[in-house]
Amino acid sequence: MKVGLVLEGGAMRGLFTAGVLDVFLENNIDVTDIVGVSAGTLFGVNYVSKQPKRALRYNVNYINDKRYMSLKSWIKTGNLINKDFTYYKVPFQLDVFDNITFKESKTSFYATVTNIENGEAEFIKITDPYKQMETLRATSALPFISEIIEVDGKKYLDGGIANSIPIDFFEKKNYDKIIVILTRPISYRKKKSTSIQFKMFYKKYPHLVEKLENRYKDYNETVEKILELEKQGKVFVIRPSEDITVKRLEKDIEKLNHVYNLGVKDGKHIIENLKEYISYKGEK
């Protein structure tokens, strides 16, 4: 049986996902393939490496460290989140990522990135996070506060621009079961953003600008589609039981802990239903 898992992004809202995934680990929930977007990728790799609480731990420990994120870094490098410290020193030295366990896992992991030259989403298979750290940077490279990331000659930004919730990744491949972890409550719909700043910053990339301008439509259409599939029993959706009000790059440790703990609480609430969904062999 093929079980797919979709992980929405959302910057620090992604700690909700981290909490849910830690409940998955506690209950030995295994999936065949994962597709992550932005923070969904960054935090989701810890599920495959079987490192509960790591995503919460390194964020709580370093979010207020100027080496992790600072205006100085943004002015100097174009990255508000410091590349060398956050993506290299932390996972390689300070809070070591279990790269061996990840590579030995039977679960395949795909990172969603946005090709800024054609505006399309691409799904890059992550087989070795240590060697593919630039791809992990690319999936979470937020517009305006991140430099454009080049991987194998292609230019990328945050995967959520082109495909915030890539459920179609699994639909096209006829997976038996699809699990979706969202970081917004059921009532949330994205509003239109001003397009002036998009055109100013990225005038060389018209396809990217078009995606940014229409992102709210694409997002809302996907949410409606997921609701319909959920009603039909074709997907299992996990979403926050309350609105998550943290800022994208929240620095309040208490709030970060709350988001993670909400994920744990909501994960425990649905876990038995999830087990039943996965084990059910009837019509999809």
Model-derived segments and spans:
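Patatin-like phospholipase
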Residues: M1-V37, V45-K284
